[in-house]
């Protein structure tokens, strides 16, 4: 029997397959049709839609275990990429993935989850004890702060469970994600994964990364003044007079907004779970959110008066707002771009759009892995306890290829973020017409 003749497709021809119902990707030079798979893709539809029509080997390697490769054959179109090539950066990146796998750095680290759960149990017990068995206002305030710390730590577990297997059993891993996010925090793990996977794929794309799309309250670039389109939310991000007013003073309102940011996450979670959007384990997630909506208000109701109840809730939200600040520090002051994420410069875009936070090892528990955000973006399935180990390898690779490896102290990162917000705020004040008088009496009397 004669050998089968290979069929080829060029990169330009591949680009034409980037529309709903016609989604092709290339992995190691082989073209795959994922049009029908998009609705069942565990990582959601957005990554496939965003990278369709491109060579995406590096992104595939970053997000999928080795066991996934055997599933690709059923999507193979029979076409090979005629002009397929691998950059030196990608070659070295893939070598690192292979070496780290050989070193066992991707292996499950259940002890980290267990230690975090023990810490969460302690925080929960202390907060509940302070509410139920103590009478002082300051104790109740402290109990609210402890609840905020609990939400931060449960967020790290949800983050870990959403990225990789924190335990050996897949069903238990899903339960851990729902328990940490939905039951303890009231946040849908399904919504978080949908949002967070998009952020990883389109790191710092103003049109595709939802973690930069906070109009009307915050913008990190004057490019938003042109009313860009969010391909994540599938709507126009209109920069109107109200947006301009808020943005003009965003460097003053940044921290208060971060303290209240969790309220938006509650709303987004409910929208996700109560609409027709495809959600795995919808019933389990709704049950988890119901559990939270019972125990937290019940605990708050045990406080002696409405003043202390409001104080407790504000303290909880404000403390967990530190986590929202941490998310922002990693990207707000970094390089941004307009347009689709590219599959052929995966390593470069992840390093260019990300900032590490330098901290001593004994503070790793506080940052939950975000202090090594560059490493996390490049190797998202790696347990966070190993990110410090691989940092020297990443630094060396960045130096070899003259790529940025940006890092700053926690205080410096805050300063950089506020500077970015202030620069954009000042630009917003200057464009075209003055701010509407009925919105900005205070603005007319405020400077800086």
Curated annotation (Swiss-Prot):
Bilayer-crossing regions: 112-132, 137-157, 172-192, 212-232, 254-274, 286-306
Pfam family name, one: Cyt-b5
Motif (Histidine box-3): 373-377
Cross-referenced SMART domains: Cyt-b5
Enzyme class: oxidoreductase
Presence of the UniProt keyword Transmembrane in the record: yes
Record protein name field: Acyl-lipid (9-3)-desaturase
Biological source species: Borago officinalis (Bourrache)
